[in-house]
């Protein structure tokens, strides 16, 4: 197994241009496919999850051209549902942002489509989405365990009507349903069962749909209306914002060991909810400055916080390791959906934080972290989870340094992360 040793870093300073957002990249690729016209996507994320989406689209007959660095994609929209005369099997790795939307999109046309992935994907739920698609006439069959991939879709189109979908596990289910609703046979009204998690990710979806010419009526995140007759039309160009979750590591670095760290590509004008991570750092005592397309974080003495972080589930992981440098016990609440991500992130985070000496209380949907007087070094397991690797890079700010096992798992969203991180060290 590959290991990466991070020696202690005394100070960070510099500017980082954040690579494109995973959430926006894969949504935009699918909408561009369904739209009339050619779309040029710039600042597209070059990572595993995006490559799985692109490979699947190519297999389904979508034409696109990528720049040499894979960050500009010119894609010819088909302006219609995806169809295939031959049965297709699509391998989607562990990319939830490809699996869930494609599962929905492939019900719209005609053909037989089997969706598979890595072993962890077979443990990541998709049942709430499939239940909703079945209410609109979709024919979806599970191949192993009910409610989980792999699955086969026998597509004949999607009916209009009322549909209920659970919102308490993952916002990706609703995102997938929203994106395909305009191509159903008539009006679609979506009712949310339970409390909708990660609402800012739904805002991203609705904003991107609007860019492609489709309006969604949002009734306080309890009901959504999508009128028939709205087809997707390419806006010509789409700039993919920097990934706000990826920005969190550099902003935290500035707060812990700044100096001053400026991240560009996200800012006040961002459509991503995870930019609110900077507000949490500010509550912890960091000095934060906002621009339209940048955020600056400056070092300060940090104190613990006790917050509901359901709205920033990915970036909240960075607070868990930043808490090691704050005075007091930090409580991160309402984060059950950590358990159904790339790994069970609540269990993984608790295990690895204890390795460096933290006192941790892991609950059903919360984690509480009391830092040790002095963190100690450890070999950190990353569970094939990119965010675990990036979060624990914060331990380079302790006097002992840290060793990251399987550091290349960051290729899921940020292949160049550790080089960029090292570039900030003074």
Curated annotation (Swiss-Prot):
Highest rank taxon of the organism: Bacteria
Entry keyword annotation includes Ribonucleoprotein: no
Tagged with keyword Transferase: yes
Pathway(s): Metabolic intermediate biosynthesis; chorismate biosynthesis; chorismate from D-erythrose 4-phosphate and phosphoenolpyruvate: step 6/7
Enzyme Commission number, as recorded: 2.5.1.19
Pfam family, one: EPSP_synthase
Keywords (A to Z) from UniProt: Amino-acid biosynthesis, Aromatic amino acid biosynthesis, Cytoplasm, Transferase
Record's GO cellular component terms: cytoplasm
Residue numbers binding phosphoenolpyruvate: 22, 96, 124, 172, 345, 387, 412
NCBIfam families: aroA
Subunit architecture: Monomer.
Function: Catalyzes the transfer of the enolpyruvyl moiety of phosphoenolpyruvate (PEP) to the 5-hydroxyl of shikimate-3-phosphate (S3P) to produce enolpyruvyl shikimate-3-phosphate and inorganic phosphate.
Protein name: 3-phosphoshikimate 1-carboxyvinyltransferase
Gene name for this UniProt entry: aroA
């Amino acid at each position: 197994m590959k290991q990466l040793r991070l020696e202690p870093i005394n100070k960070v300073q510099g500017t980082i241009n954040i690579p494109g957002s995973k959430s926006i990249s894969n949504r935009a690729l699918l909408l561009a496919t369904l739209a009339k016209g050619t779309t040029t996507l710039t600042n597209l994320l070059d990572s595993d999850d995006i490559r799985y989406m692109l490979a699947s689209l190519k297999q389904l007959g979508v034409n696109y051209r990528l720049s040499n660095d894979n960050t500009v994609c010119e894609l010819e929209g088909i302006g219609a549902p995806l169809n295939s005369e031959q049965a297709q099997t699509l391998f989607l790795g562990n990319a939830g942002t490809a699996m869930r939307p494609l599962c929905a999109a492939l019900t719209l046309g005609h053909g037989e489509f089997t969706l598979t992935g890595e072993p962890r994907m077979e443990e990541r739920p998709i049942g709430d989405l499939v239940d909703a698609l079945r209410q609109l006439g979709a024919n979806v069959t599970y191949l192993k365990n009910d409610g989980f991939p792999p699955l086969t879709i026998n597509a004949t189109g999607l009916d209009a009507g009322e549909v209920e979908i659970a919102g308490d596990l993952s916002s990706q289910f609703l995102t997938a349903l929203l994106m395909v609703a305009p191509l159903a046979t008539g009006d679609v009204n979506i009712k949310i069962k339970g409390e909708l998690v990660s609402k800012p990710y739904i805002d991203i979806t609705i904003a991107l749909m609007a860019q492609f010419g489709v309006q969604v009526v949002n009734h306080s995140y309890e009901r959504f209306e999508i009128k028939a007759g709205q087809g997707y039309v390419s806006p010509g160009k789409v700039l993919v914002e920097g990934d706000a979750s990826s920005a969190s590591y550099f902003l935290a670095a500035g707060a812990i060991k700044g100096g001053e760290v400026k991240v560009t590509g996200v800012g006040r004008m961002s459509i991503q909810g995870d930019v609110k991570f900077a507000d949490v750092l500010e509550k912890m005592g960091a000095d934060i400055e906002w621009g339209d397309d940048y955020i600056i974080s400056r070092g300060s003495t940090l104190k613990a916080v006790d917050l509901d972080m359901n709205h920033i589930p990915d970036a909240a992981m960075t607070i868990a390791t930043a808490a090691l440098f704050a005075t007091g016990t930090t409580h991160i609440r309402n984060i059950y959906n950590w358990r159904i991500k790339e790994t069970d992130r609540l269990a993984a985070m608790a295990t690895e934080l204890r390795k460096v000496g933290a006192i941790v209380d892991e609950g059903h949907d919360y984690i509480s972290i009391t830092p040790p007087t002095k963190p100690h070094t450890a070999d950190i397991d990353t569970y094939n989870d990119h965010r675990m690797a990036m979060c624990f890079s914060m331990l380079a700010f302790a006097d002992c340094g840290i060793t990251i096992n399987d550091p290349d798992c960051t290729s899921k969203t940020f292949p160049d992360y550790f080089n960029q991180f090292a570039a900030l060290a003074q």
